[in-house]
A protein has these predicted regions:
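Conserved class I S-adenosyl-L-methionine
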Residues: 23-26, 31-82, 93-97, 114-117, ...
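C-terminal alpha-helical "lid/dimerization" subdomain adjacent to the S-adenosyl-L-methionine
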Residues: 44, 51, 56-66, 181-242
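Local beta-strand N-terminus motif with an aromatic residue
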Residues: 81, 146-147, 225
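Class I SAM-dependent methyltransferase SAM/SAH-binding core
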Residues: 85-138
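A short acidic, Gly/Pro-enriched loop at the edge of an enzyme's catalytic core
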Residues: 137-149
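A short SAM/SAH-binding and catalytic strip from SAM-dependent methyltransferases
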Residues: 147-160
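A short glycine-rich, Lys/Arg-flanked "PGG" loop and its adjoining helix->strand segment in the class I
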Residues: 162-174
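C-terminal lobe and adjacent flexible extensions of AdoMet/dcAdoMet transferase-like proteins
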Residues: 246-256
C-alpha cells in the first residue's frame, strides 16, 4: 500500500423529489509558478478550533452518511475513472467508494488537521493514493493531467468558486468529467432561501467557511465546463435545516 503526502513548494436539468501565507501553484513536477493571494479570510486552520472541527467531523456526518449520504457518494463516484483528483477530501469519507476504474487517485485538502485524519484513513484503507495539502483554487497539476475531478460538499467552503472551476477546467483533459455533489441555495422556496441568507454569516464562521446560500449550479453553468446532467433533491436526514437543497451532477470539459 502506497501513501504519499505532499505539500506545495512555492446539460440537462431534472428536478427530483489557513494557512496565513498565500499558496503557490506548482506543477506535478513540481516547479514553482508563482503565488496568489486568497481573497477571503476564514477561521484559522492552525487554531484549536480547526483541530476540534477535524476531530468531530466524522461524528457530525454520521447520521447523514447512514441515512443516504454514503449512497449518494457511492452512486456519484461509480462514474469516476482514470486519473482522478478529489477536491477538499476532508477526512476521506469518499475513499471506500472509488471504483477500480480509477487508475490513479490524488486527494487534495488544505486543512492540516483534516490531512492528518485523511492520512490515517488512507493507510487503513489499503489503497494507493497521493495526498496533497493544497487549496482547490490552486491545483498543483499541469493542464490536461486529470480525467476526473470530484467535489462532494466542497464548493460551499472554497473562497473563490469561479477560480476553483477555472482550475478544474484547466487540469481536466479534453472530455474529462467533473463530478459534483453540493448543498446549494434554494431555488424552489423563497422562505428557505431567505433563511439561508440570514444564517450564512454565522455558519461561515462556525463551519470552516461554509456558505449555505451559494448559487453553485449557476457558477458551474458560467464556468468553462459544459453541464452534462444535474438533478435536484434534498439532503438526507442529519443535514442542517438550511442545507437541505442539493444538486448532484456531471460537467465535462468540452473540445475547443
Amino acid at each position: 500500500m502506497k501513501t504519499k503526502t505532499r505539500q506545495p513548494t512555492g446539460g440537462t436539468t431534472a428536478a427530483i423529489g489557513s494557512a496565513p501565507a498565500p499558496w503557490p501553484r506548482v506543477s506535478a513536477s513540481p516547479t514553482n509558478a508563482g503565488s496568489t493571494e486568497r481573497p477571503e479570510a476564514r477561521p484559522s486552520r492552525g487554531t484549536i478550533y480547526g483541530r476540534l472541527f477535524a476531530r468531530f467531523y466524522d461524528g457530525a456526518m454520521k447520521q447523514l452518511e447512514r441515512e443516504g449520504g454514503a449512497e449518494l457518494r457511492h452512486n456519484l463516484l461509480a462514474q469516476a475513472s482514470g486519473r482522478t483528483l478529489e477536491l477538499g477530501a476532508g477526512t476521506g469519507l469518499n475513499l471506500e467508494h472509488y471504483p477500480e476504474a480509477v487508475t490513479e487517485l490524488t486527494l487534495t485538502e488544505p486543512d492540516p488537521h483534516m490531512v492528518k485524519r485523511l492520512r490515517c484513513r488512507l493507510e487503513e484503507s489499503g489503497r494507493d493514493a497521493t495526498i496533497i495539502q493544497a487549496p482547490a483554487e490552486q491545483l498543483p497539476f499541469d493542464a490536461g493531467a486529470i480525467d476526473t475531478v470530484v467535489s462532494t460538499w466542497t464548493l460551499c467552503t472554497v473562497d473563490d468558486p469561479d477560480a476553483v472551476l477555472a482550475e478544474v477546467a484547466r487540469v481536466l483533459d479534453t472530455g474529462g468529467r467533473f463530478l459534483f455533489l453540493e448543498h446549494v441555495r434554494s431555488e424552489d422556496s423563497e422562505r428557505t432561501a431567505r433563511r439561508q441568507d440570514r444564517v450564512t454569516p454565522l455558519v461561515r464562521r462556525a463551519i470552516c467557511g461554509c456558505r449555505p446560500n451559494r448559487r453553485t449550479l449557476a457558477t458551474i453553468e458560467a464556468s468553462p465546463l459544459e453541464l452534462e446532467h444535474v438533478r435536484w433533491g434534498e439532503q438526507p436526514k442529519g443535514s442542517l435545516p438550511w442545507e437541505k437543497p442539493m444538486i448532484v451532477g456531471i460537467a465535462r470539459k468540452p473540445s475547443i
